[in-house]
Amino acid sequence: MVRIAIAGAAGRMGRNLVKAAHHNSEASVGAGSERPESSLVGVDVGELCGEGRFDVALVDDLSKAVEEFDVIVDFTAPVSTLANIELCKRHGKKLIIGTTGFSEEEKLVIDAASKEMAIVMAPNYSVGVNLVFKLLEKAAKVMGDYCDVEIVEAHHRHKVDAPSGTAIGMGEAIAGAMGNELNDVAVWSREGITGERTKDEIGFATIRAGDIIGEHTAMFADIGERVEITHKATDRMTFANGAIKAAVWLNDKPAGFYTMTDVLGLNDL
């Protein structure tokens, strides 16, 4: 049984992660944390999520419950995730990172940490999205040289980063399959007189509205036809279940940097 700590357990995603861990036969909820200023600190994590009493009180710092978990699942914010990396390094814990919006420098910190600890990091933990990444690699190898590639993503009004980590992951899959670095070919937005698009660019468009959980479309557009590969999430539990699956998988792995491709065994597709 893998004992899991949920960072940000009182948030929308955090509560779903608690539920997913509780209902996974190979996992249990060992700890949950929330910001120190939260009025929910001290509340039972299970009761908070409507799952009954777990006898696990929400703490303001996971270091206070370090003996109660094996793996942290973190879908919070970069500064909090980086702090949890240091905690994991000190205490021999493992980490699932679902946080997005890291700077390039912060990504280097995560990569360096993976030499000392086991990390799974993915822009999206749903099985469907990770299959889409593989499909995009295949499509890019066939159509990328002659099609215009555009990525459109939509999320709820509360999402604070753009484009989404999943959209960036889609772009990285396409660019990598074509032998490019995404930062060299990405056009993150367009406004005003932009001139004609260049052959290699990958365009991004972002929508923020209402309660959209997450919708992503990659478009390969040629003259006379267009191929679109789309994923639509209708319930956050799909992300939560995937993250807990990753935590169970990671528990017996050595130090290293892993992705959902590793967790799901998609490397040979």
UniProtKB/Swiss-Prot annotation:
One of the protein's GO biological processes: lysine biosynthetic process via diaminopimelate
Domain of life: Bacteria
Family: Belongs to the DapB family.
Keywords, comma-separated and alphabetical: Amino-acid biosynthesis, Cytoplasm, Diaminopimelate biosynthesis, Lysine biosynthesis, NAD, NADP, Oxidoreductase
Functional description taken from the UniProt entry: Catalyzes the conversion of 4-hydroxy-tetrahydrodipicolinate (HTPA) to tetrahydrodipicolinate.
Full protein name: 4-hydroxy-tetrahydrodipicolinate reductase
Main EC class the enzyme belongs to: oxidoreductase
Pathway field: Amino-acid biosynthesis; L-lysine biosynthesis via DAP pathway; (S)-tetrahydrodipicolinate from L-aspartate: step 4/4
Catalytic activity entry: (S)-2,3,4,5-tetrahydrodipicolinate + NAD(+) + H2O = (2S,4S)-4-hydroxy-2,3,4,5-tetrahydrodipicolinate + NADH + H(+); (S)-2,3,4,5-tetrahydrodipicolinate + NADP(+) + H2O = (2S,4S)-4-hydroxy-2,3,4,5-tetrahydrodipicolinate + NADPH + H(+)
EC number: 1.17.1.8
Active site, UniProt feature: 155, 159
GO molecular function: 4-hydroxy-tetrahydrodipicolinate reductase; NAD binding; NADP binding; oxidoreductase activity, acting on CH or CH2 groups, NAD or NADP as acceptor
Compartments, record wording: Cytoplasm
Binding site for NADP(+): 35
Principal subcellular localisation of the protein: cytoplasm
Sites where the protein binds NAD(+): 8-13, 34, 98-100, 122-125
Binding residues for (S)-2,3,4,5-tetrahydrodipicolinate: 156, 165-166
Lineage: Bacteria, Pseudomonadati, Pseudomonadota, Gammaproteobacteria, Vibrionales
Organism: Vibrio atlanticus (strain LGP32) (Vibrio splendidus (strain Mel32))
GO cellular component, one term: cytosol
